[in-house]
Amino acid sequence: MIYGNVEKEIIQLNEHTVWSGSPNRNDNPEALAALPEIRKMIFEGNHKEAEKLANKAIITKKSHGQMFQPVGNLNLSFEGHQNYTDYYRELDIEKAISTTSYVVNGITYSREAFASFADRVIVVRLTASKAGSLAFTTNYSSPHKIKKFSVKNLDLQINGTTSDQDGVKGMVEFKGITRIKLEGGKIAKTDTSLSISETTAATIFISIASNFNNYHDISGDEEKRAEDYMNKAFGKTFANLKAEHIKGYQKYFNRVKLDLGTTDATKLPTDERLNNFRNTNDPQMVALYYQFGRYLLISSSQPGGQAANLQGIWNNRLSPPWDSKYTININAEMNYWPAEKTNLSELHEPFLQMVKDLSITGQQTAKDMYGARGWMAHHNTDIWRATGAIDGAFWGMWTAGGGWVSQHLWEHYLYTGDKAFLASAYPALKGAAQFYVDFLIPHPNKNNWLVVNPGNSPENAPAAHDGSSLDAGVTMDNQIVFDVFNTAIRAAQILKKDASFIDTLRIMKAKLPPMHIGQHNQLQEWLDDIDDPNDKHRHISHLYGLYPSNQISAYRTPELFEASKNSLIYRGDVSTGWSMGWKVNWWAKLQDGNHAYKLIQNQLTPIGNERGAGGTYNNLFDAHPPFQIDGNFGCTSGITEMLMQSDDGAIHLLPALPDVWPSGSISGLKARGGFEIMEMVWKDSKLIKLVVKSSLGGNLRLRLPNDLKLANGATLKEAKGENSNPFYFLNETAKPIISEKASIKAPTLAATKLYDIATQKGQIITLSL
C-alpha cells in the first residue's frame, strides 16, 4: 500500500502467507455426545437452551481463528520537502502502477511503484528533474513483537515472527530485503537505515518471503527465498521490470472492456467524483469502479498464492477487524463471484485450492464432531484451514460453510468445461454431499422432511426464538444441501462414477423441505412463518436460492421469484457495504436495473470514518465499515449480472439495464459453457450488435431484449424445450408451500426473444439488427 505522503512516505508491506499462529486444529471433541440433546431441544422449541449447550459443547475451546498480519512499513524520509506544490497522485488500474509527483524549490520529484508478479518484488523508482538533487533516508518499522532490523552490506533487512493467538504459537517467520540501485550519487548506512544523497534517480527493490509452504508445513527457508527473489530481479533494468509487470498484469486486465459513456465529471479527482456521484451523471465512475474490482482481484489472488481474504491482501494492523481471515458464510464466496464471468478464471485458483484443502481438514471435523463421513466447515477459516466452530453458537453453529464453498468448484467447471479439473475436484464435491447424507435428520414436526439440525440463518435470529439463531430446516441450509446434492450427482454422471451414491442422493433430495412463502408474501427465512417485515438485517441468507444459486427463476418459479422480491423490499436498501453489493446482484436477478443502480448509488456513497452505514472510502475501497473488500467484488459481480446472466438455461443479455445507461458496450465477459461475449453493443436501450465465441461448441441459447439477425441476414431459430447444452442443465425446484394468508402476484417481466444457435468449437457468431 502506497500512502503518497510527501516528506514521510510510507510503503506498507503485506505478504500473503504472513499470518499469526501455526498449524493447528480447533475441533471440539464434546460435540458428538451433545448433538442428540441439542437436536431434541430444537425440535421441541427450546432454542435458547440448545444455543447454551452448543456454546459449551460445539464451539471451540481452542483457536477462534488466526490473523492475517502485516510485515511492516518501509519508511522514506525526504528532508526539506514539507513545503511543496503541484501535488499529484494516481493509481493506473490499466497498468497497476502507482505514481506520486510534486514540486519543491522548482524541482519536480516523481515516484512510481508496482508489485511485480513475475519477479516477486515491489519496485519503487524515485526521480528528480534536476541532476543530483534527490536525497532520502529509508528504514523499516513493524508492529510485531519479535522483529529485527539490520543492514547487511547495503541491503536493508527485516526479520520477524508472527504473533501467538488463542494459545497457538506464532511460527511464521518472514524476511524482507530492500536494495537500492542508484543513478549517480552516494549511499551511506547505519545499523538499521540507508541514506541516499546527490542522486538523480533511485530504484528501490523490496523482496519478502516466509517459511510457509502450506497449511501443515512451515519448513520453508524465508532467508533463501527473499534473497533469490531479490537477486533475480536486481539484475534487470527498471524498464524491463516495468514492461514485464505491465505485460503480466494486462494479460488478465485487458480481457474485459466496459464503456457506459463519459461526461465532464471524469475530469475531476476520484474523491470529488465519489462525493458528487449521487447527484451527477457520471456513468464512467461505474465503469471505473467495476474495473477497480477486477484490479483488486488480479492483485490479491494470483495463481499459486493464498485466496483474497476479508481485506484482500491489504492490512496494516497486527489485530485487524475480524482477523482479516475468511468468513465463509458469505464474504469469502463474494470475493470470487466476479472471477469466472469477468474473465479471470485463473485467479479463482487460490480459492479453489483452499476449498480442496478444507475438504481434507474438514474430514476430521465431520467425523469427530458430528459422526459423519465426508467433510464440512463452519462459518470461518484461515490460512491453517481450521474447520471448527468459532465465535459463539449464534454465529458459529452453522454447518454449511463447506457445502457453499464447494459450489465454486462446480462453477469453475461450468465455465471452463475442464474435465480434468472436475475429476480433481470430485472428491471434495462428493465429500460435501457425504456429510449431509449422514448429518440430515427427519423433522418430527414437519412431514419428516430431512433437515439440517442444528443450523441457522447466518447471523440472524427470529424474535420468536428469544434471540437464539439455532433452528432446524432453515431455508438457506435447505438450498445449500439441494445444490450440494445436485452438483455431486451431475459430477458423478459426467465422470461416470458412483451410481449407487447418485441413487442415494436423489432419494434424499426428494425429502428436503420445499421453500415456503409466508403470510407477508415473503420467502420464508425459516420453516415456520415467523419472519418480521421490519427486520433490516444485513444478511438475507434465504435469498441464496436467487443468487448465487439459480433455484429461483423468473421463468421457472414465478411465485418464489416474486416472494424473493418482497423479502428484499422488506429488508431495505441501505446496509453494510458488502450487503449492498449482494443486493446489486439480487436486483439484477430480479430484472430491475433501476433498483440495482440505486444500490450502486448507495454503495458509492462516500464514508469519511469507520462508523455508520456502509459505502465507499475515497480510495474506492468498500466500507462495511470498516474496510472489507467483499463489497468491491460483489458490486463488480452485480454490474456484470445487470448486463449478462447465464445461469437460467440461456445467456440472458441486458436483463437489468438501468435507464441511466441507454447506450454502451462491453467485451470479454464469459458465460457458462465456454462462451465469450467478444462484443456487445446497445443503443437507446436496444441491443444492436453481438459477437459470441464458442470455445467448447454446443447449443448457444440466447435470451435477447429485441430481435437480432445473423451476419448473413438469416433469421434466428426460436428456442423450444430444454437447452440441449449440458452446461445449461437446470435442476427442478420443488413447488413452494404458500401460506393461506399470502396473495402472490405474477411477476411483471420485460418481453424477450429466445433463440438457439448450434455452434462448433472455436466458432464465432455475429449478430446485428
In which residue ranges do the predicted regions lie?
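Inter-helical turn/loop segments and adjacent helix faces that build the functional surface
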Residues: T342-E346, L409-A425, L440-H443, F485-F501
